């Protein structure tokens, strides 16, 4: 998914809200893709009309959240995407709204979630819930499940982090609290003369909090991404790091390998499911190394296309089925 596009809005053809069919212009689908391309294509086949917005397209008039949105149509032939002319309207006129904004979590994101929280959710199903997105930092949310995670310390103190490194036996991973795609993640070894320099840079000389976590040697076998829908695992992909890396993220060269959802993975999902549902975090990606949960990705989880390709499945069907059921519950249809 491109970080350019932040929202996907969905309306069925039999809805009261209609799309403009004129003034289309062509764009590269990599910029226009607001969620996995397969999901958008699948919705089109079911007769849904798809629109997209970016953060700057949102605004509030009176007490009504509104936005400037554009119709999106994907095609197999070139050009791969057509985007309609912009038009304005109330967000709750859509049947569903899906927020897909990559980290970092900045003030623009923060205020967008407040605006989206004003949508009448008896009229429009919003996924994930704006309040849940606002409160669920992707690094810190996992700390709500201390029995499922490796030993962890969050601090801005270099001395405290170094003491923790020693306590862990001299190896540790540190990561920023607002990063994504493996950016800013470092492996620390107590014997490395660069350790102090890395901590200085990572903490901005003690002014920025970071997460320190026990190094898990199982990372050599891969970092597993589990796609979770409404608390249930849909599928998983293993991201195996390069020999020279400690990060399995695809952005830094990790190779996607077929894997299974294990009984331990199901245990993790069952442990998280009640809180995920309570927070309205219906579509998430869990990162698991060995038997430990390391992150809960809630803003823009990826992995559907990789699981589809490796397992010859179509996970987007399950996601769209779920959204359709939520909309039907709202409308009573």
Language-model regions: role of each:
Residues 1-18:
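Short, strongly patterned local motifs
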Residues 18-28:
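Nucleotide-activated donor-dependent transferases that construct or modify glycoconjugates
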Residues 29-32, 260-333:
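ATP-dependent carboxylate activation and anion-phosphoryl transfer catalytic cores
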Residues 31-154:
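Conserved N-proximal alpha/beta basic substrate-recognition cap immediately N-terminal to
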Residues 101-104, 177-179, 301:
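Short glycine-rich anion-binding loops that position phosphate/pyrophosphate groups of nucleotides
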Residues 130-134, 239-242, 289-292:
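Short glycine-enriched loops at secondary-structure junctions
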Residues 149-169:
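Rossmann-like NAD(P)H-binding beta-loop-alpha module
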Residues 158-159, 168-170, 178-268, 272, ...:
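Phosphate-binding site of ATP-dependent enzymes
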């Amino acid at each position: 998914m491109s970080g350019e596009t932040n929202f996907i809005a969905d309306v069925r053809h039999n809805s009261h809200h209609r799309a403009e069919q004129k003034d289309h212009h062509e764009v590269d689908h990599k910029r226009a893709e607001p969620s996995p391309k397969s999901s958008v294509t699948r919705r089109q086949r079911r007769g849904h009309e798809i629109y997209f917005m970016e953060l700057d397209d949102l605004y509030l008039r009176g007490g009504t959240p509104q936005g400037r949105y554009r119709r999106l149509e994907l095609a197999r032939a070139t050009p791969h995407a057509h985007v309609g002319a912009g038009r304005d309207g109330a967000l709750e006129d859509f049947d569903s709204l899906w927020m897909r904004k990559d980290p970092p979590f900045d003030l623009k994101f923060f205020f967008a979630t407040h605006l989206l929280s004003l949508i009448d959710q008896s009229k429009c199903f919003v996924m994930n819930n704006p309040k849940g997105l606002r409160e669920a930092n992707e690094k810190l949310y996992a700390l709500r499940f201390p029995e499922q995670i490796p030993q962890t310390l969050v601090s801005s103190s270099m001395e405290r982090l170094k003491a923790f490194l020693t306590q862990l036996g001299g190896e540790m991973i540190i990561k920023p609290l607002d990063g994504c795609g493996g950016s800013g993640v470092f492996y620390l070894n107590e014997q490395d003369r660069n350790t102090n320099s890395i901590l200085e840079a990572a903490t901005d000389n003690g002014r920025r909090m970071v997460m320190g976590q026990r190094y898990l040697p199982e990372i050599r076998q891969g970092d597993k991404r589990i796609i979770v829908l409404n608390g249930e695992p849909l599928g998983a992909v293993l991201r195996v790091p390069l020999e020279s890396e400690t990060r399995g993220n695809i952005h830094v060269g990790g190779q996607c390998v077929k894997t299974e959802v294990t009984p331990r993975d199901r245990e993790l999902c069952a442990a998280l499911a009640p809180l995920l549902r309570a927070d309205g975090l219906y579509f998430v990606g869990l990162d698991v190394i060995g038997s430990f949960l390391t992150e809960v990705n809630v803003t823009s989880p990826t992995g559907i296309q990789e699981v589809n390709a490796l397992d010859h499945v179509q996970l987007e069907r399950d996601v769209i089925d779920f959204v359709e059921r939520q909309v039907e519950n709202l409308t009573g249809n």
